[in-house]
């Protein structure tokens, strides 16, 4: 392999750490933000250079289309468990990862990308309980009726998704809780993933 420049080595290390911590590569925008580039295009140029040197493969058509070559593949650390999520930061940002669990992502359909510890009892009627580890498949869109991990403004919540026009209703599965109503014309909402399974608290240490 041809030698890397210091900047290329820094980017390659960032990619490896992101995959080890979150199970997926960073986006171009995330690379640019973390390393202080002015735009995602600057990150793209460095990625092309790494691809030419045989460190990575670039897969077109996806923001996370970066694959390490076999000799660069990091050790599998398992699924990351996400803790408290800081305002404005990606849910899979490295600083949010509390630890990793040796759970096979293919146990779930679709496969899980990360785990989220359940807080509260708002989803207890469908068996999602306080302290459970919720297996989550990373997506950015959802269909009505799906159980989602959603970010409303700066809060992350697990609820059943329903969209009517420009209004989203995030329904609890506990009659003691009212729906969270989000007016998309004035509030920000993003889907962080779909719930694909539960690991009961105490079943996996």
Swiss-Prot record:
GO terms for molecular function: DNA binding; serine-type endopeptidase activity. It comes from the Bacteria. It is an enzyme of class 3 (hydrolase). Residues 28-48 bind DNA. Its EC number is 3.4.21.88. The record marks 87-88 as: Cleavage. The active site is at residues 122, 159. The keyword DNA repair applies. Pfam families: LexA_DNA_bind, Peptidase_S24. SUPFAM superfamilies: LexA/Signal peptidase, Winged helix' DNA-binding domain. Keywords: Autocatalytic cleavage, DNA damage, DNA repair, DNA replication, DNA-binding, Hydrolase, Repressor, SOS response, Transcription, Transcription regulation. GO terms for biological process: DNA repair; DNA replication; negative regulation of DNA-templated transcription; proteolysis; SOS response. The keyword tRNA-binding does not apply. It catalyses: Hydrolysis of Ala-|-Gly bond in repressor LexA. Belongs to the peptidase S24 family. Homodimer. NCBIfam families: lexA. Represses a number of genes involved in the response to DNA damage (SOS response), including recA and lexA. In the presence of single-stranded DNA, RecA interacts with LexA causing an autocatalytic cleavage which disrupts the DNA-binding part of LexA, leading to derepression of the SOS regulon and eventually DNA repair. This is LexA repressor. It comes from Shewanella loihica (strain ATCC BAA-1088 / PV-4).
């Amino acid at each position: 392999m041809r030698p890397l420049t210091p900047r290329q080595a820094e980017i390659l290390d960032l990619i490896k750490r992101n995959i080890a911590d979150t199970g997926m590569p960073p986006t171009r925008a995330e690379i640019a933000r973390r390393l202080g580039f002015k735009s995602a295009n600057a990150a793209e140029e460095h990625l092309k250079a790494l691809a030419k040197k045989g460190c990575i493969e670039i897969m077109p058509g996806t923001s996370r289309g970066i694959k390490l070559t076999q000799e660069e593949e990091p050790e599998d650390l398992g699924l990351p468990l996400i803790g408290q999520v800081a305002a404005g930061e990606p849910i899979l940002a490295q600083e949010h990862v509390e630890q990793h669990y040796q759970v096979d992502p293919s146990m779930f359909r679709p496969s899980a990308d990360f785990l989220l510890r359940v807080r509260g009892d708002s989803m207890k009627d469908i068996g999602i309980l306080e302290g459970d580890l919720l297996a989550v498949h990373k997506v950015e869109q959802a269909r009505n009726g799906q159980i989602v991990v959603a970010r409303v403004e700066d809060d992350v919540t697990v609820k059943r998704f329903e969209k009517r026009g420009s209004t989203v209703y995030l329904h609890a599965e506990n009659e003691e809780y009212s729906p969270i109503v989000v007016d998309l014309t004035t509030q920000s909402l993003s889907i962080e993933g779909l719930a694909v399974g539960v690991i009961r608290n105490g079943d996996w240490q």
